Amino acid sequence: MALAKRIIPCLDVDNGRVVKGVKFENIRDAGDPVEIARRYNEQGADEITFLDITASVDGRDTTLHTVERMASQVFIPLTVGGGVRTVQDIRNLLNAGADKVSINTAAVFNPEFVGEAADRFGSQCIVVAIDAKKVSAPGEAPRWEIFTHGGRKPTGLDAVEWAKKMEGLGAGEILLTSMDQDGMKNGFDLGVTRAISDALGIPVIASGGVGNLQHLADGILEGHASAVLAASIFHFGEYTVPEAKAYMAARGIVVR
């Protein structure tokens, strides 16, 4: 039987508030993370992802207190990321109630950290977040590069090769955000989503660009992702999680 595809609302948290921006800029406030997480839990979301978007840029640690409050209200898997740099950071987040921890910038500077984390805590709770931007010129074979620090710093790393390396080191899942599409609401970058999903044996979560329910389905059917992540379409009430699941089921996608 086909594995159910997951719908994951994403909470980008800045100084304790859920925010949403366009291409990581022009931030607008969407509310209290614990309240919002509780709403998605009640709506039947499969998981919730909480990203402290200030953490890596400011070198600040993810707010454990918010994670504790959220974990006490939410009974679906919770992935937390932002400023995760050490084994102790991961232990603190798991102890606070996170089910999975997302590593982004630190993986680029120290890839072995991913292997160490997977050995210590198990691959099932280690997610590597990849922020990719298309760098190939029109007419060239498509190529995507990894960026860090909230999409500000290029690394020169090829996104598909990097994802394969992360899988080899023990990552259990890849959270793939297209920097070109983030906040644009005109769909995932299906090219990079498909390239990475097809290259790996671990689940890939598509992120960046959802503006309607068709985009979610396209991420699965055309992007070959295992899960789809969205923020603003849920936060600002355009669609609910049950509406998204009904739409995807109608397109022939197995949902929980």
Curated annotation (Swiss-Prot):
Pfam family, one: His_biosynth
Keyword Lyase: yes
InterPro entries xrefs: Aldolase_TIM (IPR013785), His_biosynth (IPR006062), HisF (IPR004651), IGPS_HisA/HisF (IPR050064), RibuloseP-bd_barrel (IPR011060)
Cell location: Cytoplasm
Primary localization: cytoplasm
GO cellular component terms listed in the entry, alphabetical order: cytoplasm
Keyword Oxidoreductase found: no
Transmembrane regions: none
Catalytic activity, as annotated: 5-[(5-phospho-1-deoxy-D-ribulos-1-ylimino)methylamino]-1-(5-phospho-beta-D-ribosyl)imidazole-4-carboxamide + L-glutamine = D-erythro-1-(imidazol-4-yl)glycerol 3-phosphate + 5-amino-1-(5-phospho-beta-D-ribosyl)imidazole-4-carboxamide + L-glutamate + H(+)
Its job: IGPS catalyzes the conversion of PRFAR and glutamine to IGP, AICAR and glutamate. The HisF subunit catalyzes the cyclization activity that produces IGP and AICAR from PRFAR using the ammonia provided by the HisH subunit.
Family (UniProt): Belongs to the HisA/HisF family.
Known partners and oligomeric status: Heterodimer of HisH and HisF.
Protein name: Imidazole glycerol phosphate synthase subunit HisF
Species name: Pseudomonas putida (strain W619)
